[in-house]
């Protein structure tokens, strides 16, 4: 591999590494979306929540101002985090919580785990490619990185549908939401992994002969 291609491969791997770090941060954190109810009276207790792939954290905050939503009140108040429990306001949402939302959470988490697995396998191939005459390992590595990006964006879409289902359900108190920084990390990780994988594949492909006789000359030189 030429010096120019080697430099391009290393720069691409750096961006892929950044995408892998962002994917890991998104998977292990609980700030994919923030949910909040609409308050009819300013002195009510706000039950806000933020959640990720594995658990939801609900916060009870007493509202003493005229604002009828509890955006930005997540850090304060009494917080309760539980795994695969997307609603804690009361018993009426228990069935919905343990069936529909748990299925969404498990599906999104499983797909995200596949994404991390592809990242690990791709990194192993990329590391081994730095050995003597092992540039061909960059090609499967690039495919694994692209697959990791695709799995990550599928997980993002599953979570987006989960949030939409929460908001539309009559069994929950959530009517307002916004996507938080973990969601942004997942989207950025998808972009870096998928595009990085495609560029890595292009850079690792052998140079096509510009003239018909170049391939013949290469064959004769090998003998």
UniProtKB/Swiss-Prot annotation:
Q: How does it sit in the membrane?
A: Multi-pass membrane protein
Q: Where are the transmembrane segments?
A: 11-29, 110-130, 136-156, 181-205
Q: Where are the disulfide bridges?
A: 57-81
* Annotated tissue distribution: Skeletal muscle.
Molecular function GO terms recorded: calcium channel regulator activity; voltage-gated calcium channel activity
Q: How is it modified after translation?
A: N-glycosylated.
Extracellular compartment: which residues? 30-109, 157-180
Superkingdom, according to UniProt? Answer: Eukaryota
Instruction: Output the InterPro entries linked to this UniProt entry.
Output: PMP22/EMP/MP20/Claudin, VDCC_g1su, VDCC_gsu
- Single GO cellular component annotation? T-tubule
One Gene Ontology term from the biological process aspect of the record: sarcoplasmic reticulum calcium ion transport
Keywords of the record:
Calcium, Calcium channel, Calcium transport, Cell membrane, Disulfide bond, Glycoprotein, Ion channel, Ion transport, Membrane, Transmembrane, Transmembrane helix, Transport, Voltage-gated channel
Sugar-bearing residue positions: 43, 80
Q: What is its main location?
A: membrane
Subcellular localization is given as:
Cell membrane, Sarcolemma
**Listed Pfam families:** Claudin_2
Q: Which parts of the chain does the record assign to the membrane side Cytoplasmic? A: 1-10, 131-135, 206-223
Q: What is known about its subunit structure?
A: Component of a calcium channel complex consisting of a pore-forming alpha subunit (CACNA1S) and the ancillary subunits CACNB1 or CACNB2, CACNG1 and CACNA2D1. The channel complex contains alpha, beta, gamma and delta subunits in a 1:1:1:1 ratio, i.e. it contains either CACNB1 or CACNB2.
What's this chain's function? Answer: Regulatory subunit of the voltage-gated calcium channel that gives rise to L-type calcium currents in skeletal muscle. Regulates channel inactivation kinetics.
Q: Which family does it belong to?
A: Belongs to the PMP-22/EMP/MP20 family. CACNG subfamily.
Identification of the protein by name: Voltage-dependent calcium channel gamma-1 subunit
Q: Which organism is it from?
A: Rattus norvegicus
